Amino acid sequence: MENSAPLVAIVAGEASGDQHAAHLIREVKKIAPGVRFGGIAGPQMRAAGVEPLFDSSRLAVVGLVEVLSHLNEIYGAMQKMRHFLEEKHPDLLILVDYPEFNLRLAKRAKTLGIKVLYYISPQVWAWRQYRVHQIGQVVDMMAVVLPFEVPFYEQAGVPVNFVGHPLQHEVKSKFNRNEAVVEFGFNPCCKTLGLLPGSRHSEIKRLLPVLLEAAERIYSEEPEIQYLLPLAATLKEIDLAPYLKGYRLPLRVIPDRSYDVMAACDAMVAASGTVTLEAALMGVPLVVIYKMNSLSYWMGRLLIKVDHIALCNIIAGEGVAPELIQQDASPERIALEALNLLRDKERRQTMQQKFYAIKHKLGAGAQRTIAELTVAMLEGENLGRAS
């Protein structure tokens, strides 16, 4: 007998999307326990009960050149999802971020008459704003996590709902600073610096050697500083091993506990991405670094219309955290900025005050709201579909 329980197709293509989608799934199951999920999933979504059709970690690439080298993987994932939509005809398709892939899939879902909920908007406010109208043709509801995104969709007649930011609920640690430092076997009387090279293999290759060289420079000036490196769920310790050889830093690699690591840190150096907002919500001062293929970077410069690259700075509307981009993200500059931050308590406190203002801007949190929106769409409620 065929299963009549609602079926949701879901896609997340990044580590952060995997995390947000997993929380969404668990919250939906609290409201409607029978709902089934299948799609492109990472480890956290699989743990939440998604039937995985493709491993999202194989899609976690950034930049034009990097994407071109993974086209076979991306094409294979798209074919699997299209086949799933055509064969199973799910009651709802939820797309989490990952716009280049997801908007193409949304177009296919539209032709099949499948409702589409897009959770975490493409950054239309930063570049290619014309996409708002294209999105309106293939998406039934846009659930945004930043309040300033709402007008972009309202003006284009696209149904939009500000659900709050998922990180408001997700970013927390049970430890205070000293407890976290002791938890990881370090001395709470010494400063601790977090090194966060990113969650993608391409980021590790590009950023980890630079971070380690910067840490060695810092260590030569301040040998009492301790180092923590949280390992993303998309990576394994063996992925880092070749880069760590030859370094004698007081460094610990900590898998799957990024927020506890942040709680232990007096400051961090982090790759640009979701982690910069996580740091802001944890109140951890940081230096942001960004390096990618030169061609990808310069093409991005021509298209992107924002003054900052770090999400925490974009939301704040100012450069709260220093950004070191491309050639400026050198071991020398990173070491200098990190040392200045570690040595200047007043500067760290000012940054923390501005981070608190960011936290206030983001609302109460998204988990329950996005889950209720999902269930409402499954139940066929009229949510104001634009004509």
From Swiss-Prot:
Biological process terms from the Gene Ontology for this record are: lipid A biosynthetic process
Is Glycosyltransferase tagged as a keyword?
yes
Answer whether the UniProt record assigns the keyword Glycosyltransferase to this protein: yes
- Gene Ontology CC: membrane
Group of enzyme by EC = transferase
EC number(s) given by UniProt: 2.4.1.182
Q: Which domain of life is it from?
A: Bacteria
Per the record, the pathway is:
Bacterial outer membrane biogenesis; LPS lipid A biosynthesis
Q: Which reaction does it catalyse?
A: a lipid X + a UDP-2-N,3-O-bis[(3R)-3-hydroxyacyl]-alpha-D-glucosamine = a lipid A disaccharide + UDP + H(+)
Q: HAMAP family, from UniProt?
A: LpxB
The name on file for this protein is: Lipid-A-disaccharide synthase
The record lists the organism as: Nitrosococcus oceani (strain ATCC 19707 / BCRC 17464 / JCM 30415 / NCIMB 11848 / C-107)
